[in-house]
Amino acid sequence: MEIIFGQNKKEQLEPVQAKVTGSIPAWLQGTLLRNGPGMHTVGESKYNHWFDGLALLHSFSIRDGEVFYRSKYLQSDTYIANIEANRIVVSEFGTMAYPDPCKNIFSKAFSYLSHTIPDFTDNCLINIMKCGEDFYATTETNYIRKIDPQTLETLEKVDYRKYVAVNLATSHPHYDEAGNVLNMGTSVVDKGRTKYVIFKIPATVPDSKKKGKSPVKHAEVFCSISSRSLLSPSYYHSFGVTENYVVFLEQPFKLDILKMATAYMRGVSWASCMSFDREDKTYIHIIDQRTRKPVPTKFYTDPMVVFHHVNAYEEDGCVLFDVIAYEDSSLYQLFYLANLNKDFEEKSRLTSVPTLRRFAVPLHVDKDAEVGSNLVKVSSTTATALKEKDGHVYCQPEVLYEGLELPRINYAYNGKPYRYIFAAEVQWSPVPTKILKYDILTKSSLKWSEESCWPAEPLFVPTPGAKDEDDGVILSAIVSTDPQKLPFLLILDAKSFTELARASVDADMHLDLHGLFIPDADWNAVKQTPAETQEVENSDHPTDPTAPELSHSENDFTAGHGGSSL
């Protein structure tokens, strides 16, 4: 078995044509753009955690039945500094980098001081975000990197802190029908408060305000929620939205800010400053988008760890939301590279299997309701919300399915009643070996698998003009533990889950995390421009001859959604 995790991957800078078997639907024209860690060793130094690896972008351009593949490392400041030094010099969440041992004591002391309030990495390895006419590689720090989706060139570095007060931000924003972006971040001890900030980025900017600036630079705070702890805010990877509400889980998987501030001096990583409190609760915050204020009732559930929200919607006076939940934080621990050896598949076991859980939260609590009564009147779920003596509401979920991760949906149904979830099947081992279609209504599933194959997150692309929720295709980049088998792009019929085609690539492809599909409806005569604040090298780099230019119509793309780096 070939080791998949932790290997350095080679870039495929020029497009290489894939070998297509089967038949690609004629309507499927566009680019699948994905992101994930691709380099874990720099010189003699190694990252500790798989999620620390340097970002490697890759794309599949699908046109007229042909597929072209290319990949390129994100030219972040982190990447450039590491490569120039031929060692890891910028800290990641699971790996602390240290000053040159040849520096004198005064230089070392200054380094310790500067790391007390760390300037986080711009190694944006988790997802791709569409914002107006621009595309950005994203991570969970305050930095995002603008990229050219055709050439995979790295453009502008953007610091969220210049526009909204956040030190951390999710890589799983939401998009409304107009193309506006809604995201969340954490503001640490800002003016004496630690808070969770929901912010909005407009899809377009009025000409009077544009002045060459991207919509990100017109981001504004939508609302904020005070953290229950000033110095131990909750870690979160995603959030949910309905047509009228935002769903945020303040879970007992926490960041210890004091420990993070002293991590560099103590010689430990920032990841070691996270802890899961089994004795605490998970608090459910429901924010009304119309008033920009939280619903006043206190909702909570048992302690759990959630990385990915699946979807949320309103029904019969309740907010229903679906998440992938764990009983503990063991998933993150398993992805330390020391654990990712040849015995990984056989010996690595989660202490908690990921479960698909549905919660129902009543929007209006009857003050006269009896203590202990179930406030949920929705017939479609067995989830409960029990009124307590102090007026708080204890929510217990309906468990829909056990053993899945990396969930995706038909994004046209985001925030609305829906039926289908597409995900990677994950049992007690965190290795994804199957792609799953789960039918919430019938509680049935369809699966795809192939020996020695590890699928990436399955992404749904709808058939143009589709009326059925599952009318479309599933795209997944597949890598193999068999060195004799080429990696390939898998295309499934989303209804039947049968294989339509695959495009095998003779290239060094990595196991990625998240991304999006850009239909050719978005490609036109407007070229992505370099940043106004920095000069982009290689501006005369030739574009992919298989791709037209980009015009960025607002809604004709399939977005990453709310979903550490999973």
Curated annotation (Swiss-Prot):
Residues 530-566 are annotated as: Disordered. It catalyses: all-trans-beta-carotene + O2 = 2 all-trans-retinal. InterPro entries: Carotenoid_Oase. Disulfide bonds: none annotated. Binds 1 Fe(2+) ion per subunit. GO terms for molecular function: beta-carotene 15,15'-dioxygenase activity; metal ion binding. The lineage of its organism: Eukaryota, Metazoa, Chordata, Craniata, Vertebrata. Pathway: Cofactor metabolism; retinol metabolism. It is an enzyme of class 1 (oxidoreductase). Changing residue 308 to A: No effect on protein abundance. Loss of beta-carotene 15,15'-monooxygenase activity. Decreased iron binding. GO terms for biological process: beta-carotene metabolic process; carotene catabolic process; retinal metabolic process; retinoid metabolic process; retinol metabolic process. The keyword Zinc-finger does not apply. One of its GO terms (cellular component) is cytosol. Changing residue 49 to A: No significant effect on beta-carotene 15,15'-monooxygenase activity. Decreased stability. Pfam families: RPE65 (PF03055). Keywords: Cytoplasm, Dioxygenase, Iron, Lipid metabolism, Metal-binding, Oxidoreductase. Its cofactor is Fe(2+). Fe cation binds at residues 172, 237, 308, 514. Its EC number is 1.13.11.63. The gene is Bco1. It is found in: Cytoplasm, Cytosol. It comes from Mus musculus. Belongs to the carotenoid oxygenase family. PANTHER family: BETA,BETA-CAROTENE 15,15'-DIOXYGENASE, BETA-CAROTENE DIOXYGENASE. Changing residue 52 to A: Decreased beta-carotene 15,15'-monooxygenase activity. Decreased catalytic efficiency. Loss of beta-carotene 15,15'-monooxygenase activity. This is Beta,beta-carotene 15,15'-dioxygenase. Expressed in liver, kidney, small intestine and testis. Symmetrically cleaves beta-carotene into two molecules of retinal using a dioxygenase mechanism.
